[in-house]
Amino acid sequence: MSELTPLLKASINFAYIGAFVFVALGVYLSYRRGRLHPLLLLCISAISFSWIEAPYDWAVYAQFPPAIPRMPSWWPLNMTWGGLPASVPPGYIAYFVLPAVIGVALGRWLIATFQWRAPLTLLVTGLIVGSLWAFMFNAILGAKLGVFYYGYVIKGLALWEGTRHQYPLYDSLAMGVQMMVFTYLPGRTDT
């Protein structure tokens, strides 16, 4: 695929626009509060561990279409097959912060509606929202529709195993665990 499809363009726009919106909102809320807002801290956290994408891609042989613009060749962590897509670092903000915001809203609604305990509700909500988000984003949008592919998966722990569209289910679980933290931190109500 030598040119950007509408899906690839939408994915790249999601990365850049999502990052801009969340960082701008985090800066605004921090300014208004007079101290760092949890949303800005999530943005900083998300982009700070975007470095892991290259070694992760190398380990599972993640492959991106060649039409996606790449980081320059001198980029220190350019281990991804074909080079790391330039939209990955800002994309981490949009990819990780949006499900956290959804998890916080859903968790707070569940707490208010059913009078459930806040910490446990936020953690479980984060696990479920994060797992579903990763499945929809990585399995369906990514692997099934062709934004990227997984070259290797652990036998028996993948969907569509052995095909170009194979997806490791443990990827969804890992995202769920990450979202437990990302949902709890901004969702907690103690000061």
Give, region by region, the residue ranges found by the protein language model.
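Aromatic-rich, lipid-facing transmembrane alpha helices and their immediate juxtamembrane interface loops
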Residues: 1-191
